[in-house]
């Protein structure tokens, strides 16, 4: 049964994490309540942070205040804190308190825009992993020219063995069914070629396990040059490769969009022509790559739902990260991962 208050889904919020916190967090919660709650779903927040900063915001955003409980925390995790430092010395941080709310059953998930490494360390220490899961992985939804796909690991594990990559594929497949609404997700391993003999020992070992796993719709290897084609639903890599791939893609997309705007809008004539002829289609195409509606990475494999929003998230971005958490809870993601792993074991 889901943790609820008066039948509401409960989400813990780290109000002090992120470049624009706590304003972005409280505004994000307000935007979520006003615009992103599905019919029949009610959400309640446990908010953790500095009372001097949070109280005026809760007075201003009445709907958030009416649908939340606030707890003061005397400390917060800083962007440059090492994971070990945050774990040992930030004892009364808003991040730690929000994760502990999940551990204690006060909430079933938490959202933070704070330090990624610290959040993973704190979450793993407090919550632990799901039964039979070796390592957690960071997963996110990425756009392509035709559809979205799930990518993991995005940095939790710099080096992975065969069994971890296999479990990432399993968790990624279950995650994609929920996040992408795909009934039988197609899964691929990221590699330097599509031939079976290529890749590291871990990647080749995972290939052998996956091609003999009936519960996973495995399609073999995929190269980085192919991932934007939209032919695969889940791409699996170790955290080092996955993180580099994601950041390279984000930087390339950002540069390309900037170049288009620079060239297209360099004169009043082209501005007018684009406004008349192309603006609706251009906006529709660019919306697919809008990071604000994809602001959320999930820490898969932990014994609780943990969502990491971008560090520079604004209110809309943070609201969509909350939505991400609510969907995972509503779909009972972790129980489905437990069931999936038990069938393999």
Curated annotation (Swiss-Prot):
Segments crossing the lipid bilayer: none
Provide one Gene Ontology biological process annotation. Answer: phospholipid biosynthetic process
Q: What is the protein's name according to its record?
A: Phosphate acyltransferase
* Database matches in InterPro entries: FA_synthesis, Phospholipid_synth_PlsX-like
Organism of origin: Wolbachia pipientis subsp. Culex pipiens (strain wPip)
Where does it reside?
Cytoplasm
Q: Which GO terms describe its cellular component?
A: cytoplasm
An example of a GO molecular function for this protein is:
phosphate:acyl-[acyl carrier protein] acyltransferase activity
Per the record, the similarity remark reads: Belongs to the PlsX family.
Named in its record, the pathway it takes part in is: Lipid metabolism; phospholipid metabolism
The main location is cytoplasm
Which residues are the signal sequence here? none
Give the quaternary structure: Homodimer. Probably interacts with PlsY.
* This protein's encoding gene: plsX
